[in-house]
């Protein structure tokens, strides 16, 4: 079988003379038309530090493709900076960008009959957007992560972007002054790379490595270290080999490999967003996966890594401690990983991990010994109850108690809630409800990092619950429950909550309950009127019409 079986449609035969004429104008010569054409989906952007260094990686991959007798074709994909748009109307476009990225990669690769694609991304939605496209197309592909930012430093402490969000709450509660607030701002982000804790970008890159769609150790490398360039070039070489062997994404992205990814997400203390994104990736790959599968995996897998946001360390520390392969080897040895899954290199997981130690080095405490986990079970709990009959996602790290019952403080937007927090109107024991922020209602399912960070900064992280039909940043921790489904915009129970109602969040019992009589709930439901859409034109209006429930991954196809 030829290496260019797809691109032959545009390079072979007399009838393709015009096609070849165009290709000659972008660098093809007589000897190139029998070579595989490989797309380089480059997410480079100066919008965000996450994507600032991607062009160098794309150029390294491009050169390696040429040396491997392939013809690279580079094209751009967009990015949204979650950190910069956070807390604004702009954040409504973040989850939308996942679909735009997926659609743009699919469009370019399919339109140009490419034989493979190397996708290079950095900020949060780059990863799932690329993988959704890769899974849909089933064209040989590999993902290259742009790398993590190194930690900032101030007063002897490591800083991340979440430090800056939390500093806002510390400032409004008079725990720090304006000078210290400015110093945190100046030191939190020292250079290029994605946000440094086990936030969404590092969670998804780690999961892709575990799934076999990225190279070993690549997901925890620092963006500015030389090994990142080497890894990008090596990824290109591996992809060309996969094209020749016809190793396709759906050979790799299977039910078992997704379970491997979920196991690693639990073990590293990863982001709630991984639930949403893997539901969408599984859908694209035609793999059956439900929100309940995450709860099943949670009960089996301990949290092994002491990583921010609720822990002490960042992704570069994890890299030095042994990286994702060390975590995977521990899971494999205890029957929590499928070692027979194939990877993009053609090797199985078990073969890749063969020489990795069974336990982490004793001179570090980023990765715990198996018999001394941070938590004996996973941290991402799927709750259900009358407030979320389709389910919701709770992150239960960094809290003293996994249960709270308290009066509802109800807000119909993130901005209204944030104003109340900064005005010191939220009290210990309250359960904050932020609604009409779901996939359809927002639209776009904004992340509530600003409110949760402000609560933590004010010292309320352990004593206040927060539930929303929106999302949370990977930098969020505390008694937080997101992805509540059905959402308020479609008449979910969260739309019926009133100020002062009693709400119970119980992560141990996996329960999210509005504590009012059934007849009262039925009366409120009969009275509820659907709101008018917030947008009637443009991409947000289109998205609101197409997007599914969060319980299905907020998919649009």
From Swiss-Prot:
[2Fe-2S] cluster binds at residues 50, 123, 195. Mg(2+) binds at residues 82, 124-125, 447. Keywords: 2Fe-2S, Amino-acid biosynthesis, Branched-chain amino acid biosynthesis, Iron, Iron-sulfur, Lyase, Magnesium, Metal-binding. The keyword Cytoplasm does not apply. SUPFAM superfamilies: IlvD/EDD N-terminal domain-like, LeuD/IlvD-like. Gene3D superfamilies: IlvD/EDD C-terminal domain-like. Pfam families: ILV_EDD_C, ILVD_EDD_N. It comes from the Bacteria. The active site is at residue 473. InterPro entries: DHAD_IlvD/Edd (IPR050165), Dihydro-acid_dehy_C (IPR042096), DihydroxyA_deHydtase (IPR004404), DiOHA_6PGluconate_deHydtase_CS (IPR020558), ILV_EDD_C (IPR056740), ILV_EDD_N (IPR000581), IlvD/EDD_N (IPR037237). Its cofactor is [2Fe-2S] cluster; Mg(2+). Binds 1 [2Fe-2S] cluster per subunit. This cluster acts as a Lewis acid cofactor. One of its GO terms (biological process) is isoleucine biosynthetic process. The modification N6-carboxylysine is found at residue 125. Belongs to the IlvD/Edd family. Homodimer. Functions in the biosynthesis of branched-chain amino acids. Catalyzes the dehydration of (2R,3R)-2,3-dihydroxy-3-methylpentanoate (2,3-dihydroxy-3-methylvalerate) into 2-oxo-3-methylpentanoate (2-oxo-3-methylvalerate) and of (2R)-2,3-dihydroxy-3-methylbutanoate (2,3-dihydroxyisovalerate) into 2-oxo-3-methylbutanoate (2-oxoisovalerate), the penultimate precursor to L-isoleucine and L-valine, respectively. NCBIfam families: ilvD, PRK00911.1. This is Dihydroxy-acid dehydratase. It comes from Nitrosospira multiformis (strain ATCC 25196 / NCIMB 11849 / C 71). The lineage of its organism: Bacteria, Pseudomonadati, Pseudomonadota, Betaproteobacteria, Nitrosomonadales.
